[in-house]
Regions:
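Low-complexity, Gly/Pro
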Residues: 1, 7-10, 35, 81-83, ...
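Polysaccharide-binding and catalytic clefts of secreted carbohydrate-active enzymes
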Residues: 107-296
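Acidic (Asp/Glu)-rich catalytic clusters
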Residues: 5-11, 34-41, 71-76, 139-145, ...
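Aromatic-lined substrate-binding rim segments of carbohydrate-active enzymes
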Residues: 31-39, 43-112, 134-138, 235-246
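Alpha-helical scaffolding within the catalytic cores
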Residues: 2-5, 28-35, 66-69, 137, ...
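Boundary/entry segment of secreted carbohydrate-active catalytic domains
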Residues: 7-29
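Short, solvent-exposed turn/loop segments enriched in Gly/Ser/Thr/Pro and often Arg
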Residues: 21-23, 48-51, 84-93, 148-157, ...
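Hydrophobic faces of well-ordered beta-strands that scaffold small-molecule active sites
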Residues: 14-18, 45-47, 81-84, 148-152, ...
């Protein structure tokens, strides 16, 4: 981003930060961890992006005590907190209540619970659940003196999760097409659906571009990708608006991924104060069978 707004100016300049997961460690370790961070010159600590199940262990029942203590421990060492929304990891109880949250792959199979990013950007159930947890976290910590800025979610689209082919996604895709083309004749002309007799009589006839005998219409596929990108932007905007309401003046960022082009980063970043990206010093070398001397160059 070239735009620098007043919120972003608050955190301009190089600062050393770290990701920290207090929920993973015995509380007896937190104070020493924070002291060592300070001694190493760390200024900012990112927390809570994967902690939904600890923040809300049961529907509507929040456990803030541990997170309050973790933030206070970091603040006692003069460390600024980067507070995250925990929406990259919907908990099991939420999936069991609303299985429509799970995304559907291009093979038509539902992608299951058990890792992360197991949600569909177009799921109404997940959109509302995300609003609720963002409201809860932002209202709790929006004015906390240790919270320097915010991060929405975590690495949108990682693990091929931008595009879903669910019924909910198809419904919203049809609405997106109506807004884009106005009437079905305009879509038929733009897509050139006269080819192979693929003309549509209404937007309701249009499905996801998968499962066809041979390759799906390229315009159909392209618009589905554009739609999916807009769904990411819509979802991020919802979170940003909630955070701004409860934490005005504090910068909001998202951690994008390098060389990832599955959605429009500029459109998503347009609602943020800071566009950040995740730097992995070793890249994916730990997953590759390179010789040690090759890895040493990195």
């Amino acid at each position: 981003m070239t735009r620098v707004n007043d919120n972003a100016k608050r955190i301009m300049g190089m600062r050393l930060g770290v990701c920290y997961y207090p929920e993973h460690w015995p509380e007896a370790m937190w104070k020493d961890d924070a002291a060592r961070m300070r001694s190493l010159g760390i200024k900012q600590v990112r927390i809570a992006e994967f902690a939904w199940s600890r923040i809300e262990p049961s529907p509507g029942e929040y456990d803030w005590d541990w997170l309050d203590r973790a933030i206070d421990t970091l603040a006692a060492e003069g460390l600024d907190v980067v507070m995250c929304t925990p929406t990259a990891t919907p908990p099991k109880w939420l999936i069991d209540r609303h299985p429509d949250i799970l995304p559907v792959g291009a093979d038509g199979h539902v992608r299951g619970f058990g890792s992360r990013r197991h949600y569909d950007f177009s799921s109404p159930s997940y959109y509302e659940a995300s609003k609720a947890i963002c409201e809860a976290v932002a209202s709790r910590y929006g004015q906390h003196p240790a919270v320097a800025y915010w991060q929405t979610d975590n690495e949108y689209g990682c693990h091929q999760t931008v595009v879903s082919y669910s019924a909910a996604a198809v419904t919203r895709f049809r609405e997106w097409l109506k807004a884009r083309y106005g009437d079905i004749d305009a879509l038929n002309r733009a897509w050139g659906t006269v080819f192979w007799s693929m003309e549509y009589r209404s937007f309701d006839e249009i499905d996801a571009p998968i499962g066809t005998v041979t390759e799906a219409h390229p315009s159909h596929r392209l618009d589905y990708r554009r739609f999916a990108s807009d769904e990411v932007a819509r979802y991020n905007r919802m979170q940003v608006e909630i955070i701004r309401k409860h934490s005005p003046g504090r910068p909001i960022a998202h951690n994008f991924m390098q060389l990832f082009t599955e959605f429009d980063h500029y459109k998503v970043a347009g609602d943020l104060d800071v566009a950040s990206w995740d730097s992995y010093p070793l890249g994916a070398l730990e997953e590759q069978w390179y010789e040690p001397e090759v890895k040493a160059k990195f």
